[in-house]
Amino acid sequence: MPKVLRTLPERGFRRRARAVAVLFCAVCLGLAVRLFFLQVRTDGFYADRAQGQQLRDTVVPADRGRIYSADGLLLAANSSCWTLRASPREMPEEKITLAAHGLAEILALDEAALLEKFSDRRSNDCLLRYRVDRAAADAVRDFCEENSITGIRINQDSKRWYPQGAFLASVLGFTNVDNAGVAGLELKYDDLLTGENGVVLTAVNAWGYTLEQSYETERFPTEGDGLRLTIDSCIQHYLENALSYAVQEHHVAARAVGIVMDVNTGAVLAMSTTPSYDPNEPRVIADTAARNTVEALTGDARKAALQLAQQTQWRNKAVSDLYEPGSVFKLITCAAALDAGAITKHSSFYCGESISVAGTRFHCANHKRHGAQSVTQALENSCNQSFIQIGGRLGREAFCDYFAAFGLREPTGIDLPAEPKKSLYYTADRMGPVELASCAFGQSSKISYLEMAAAVCAVVNGGKLMQPYVVSEILAPDGSTIEQLSPVCKRQVLKAETSQTMREMMEAVVLHGGGRNAQIPGYLVGGKSGTSQKLDSADEKARIASFVAVAPIDDPQFLCLVCLDEPHSWTTAGGSLSAPVCAEVLEQTLVYRGVPRATEAPAASTAETAADLPADGDSFDGA
């Protein structure tokens, strides 16, 4: 047979067919790869999108962990409330005006604003009112049922509740509208106190309407862990009551601070900044004078004043503020000099009209001349000139070393927020003779009230610097203990014999010196007064009246520090104004804790020593 030759058109057809086949295979391969990518690699993404279109999730807020005092008093809990939301899509159009009018009346909302919200038919969710009480929620529910209004959701919620009101407010702090901690323990332990929210999933259709035959799945919320504090509610009551009276009686302008500590463990048994505020209504200015000042203003000035007043009342002055400790600090200077061997308890000093240091003249309060004195007498008389000499014998290097050893250059480490990162002080390379002189009797340095209290604990407890703390236990939701927190000794600051000598001197101050108003019948008390000048104040007469007392001083257990910032009374002397507050708080505490009245101490005296008269306090010339 003759050979059949392929024509050009036939060969062209075959080439086109092969090209189409290759293209078809490539498309199929691409589709297969894309299908694999969609179904295997990104299946979770599209499943989530589908679930988002088909399900509505409603968060069920978890309760925060509860907070208890050391003696079991409930300080912070949770109360039920209801959050109201609307789905305008689900609301019958003919009911919009009625719904806006009725709900505005029940919830005290703007009717026009509600009408605008309900008229937006594209909206599937809008907030009406956060956390209303049961009465308001029931009223809304009844109104909607009576008028056949759909699209209003009433979700159960939870909010923080402080059953004791303003009690311990500066320590507890408070939470915001989202139940997150804003201040105090609520902020410091926010992660621990915050529980795990639950959720309810409800089926919806393509337009966002809840399906009549829908299903719900639920994950229950888990309450956060709780706290048990070192704060004893009885001692806290003693302190708050005594401070409140002192603030009113002596017209204290810049708030008062009180701290009660266990000198041997660092546990804070009571802490108060007065006036306080109600953490249930933290934005309401509790102090009458501050509130009147704000209300007298208008516009931006009023807004700024309100913010300042709120920030001030929320601030835990005992932890966050720095102050000039004044003559209370002489305990630190004396202890350091004794411990370093710069002086002995038999050393003597002379106090004349004044003392000159590098051309600057210093004098004692009211220009008193104490003459020749022992160390104990210098402490009893709160003699500035003697302590300038003691500081000089100690020297700036040793002074600064002990200042640091007492923890006065660093945060105490207390488990509360907003503690200053450092105090204001002179380092050895910046401290000249004048600075050393003024620092030796408690001026020119600024430390926190808590630092001062912790340092005095070390003076009397055998020389151990203990870390202050306010939380003793972490609790599970059922009340069982998860973790027991133990006292922390930061370091040994003084020899035990130095501490013993200091206790004897502090006892003499209360028996014979400027601390007579801290005497408690039947108990031995040691202490030291202070009347410090506020060097950074525009008011040259501004003073801080303070007193620190320890009882029983022969077996130290409790320390009480009371500071009245800018009192306006017949005197500004700490021995007159603050010492009686310490005595009242400590006497009640000792009786409450069952400490027997082992001695017949002299009755309290109202006599004042010249060293603590209000004329000049701890002021000095030329500085």
What do the PLM-derived regions correspond to, one by one?
Residues 1-297, 313, 322, 397-407, ...:
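Periplasmic/cell-envelope proteins involved in peptidoglycan metabolism and beta-lactam response
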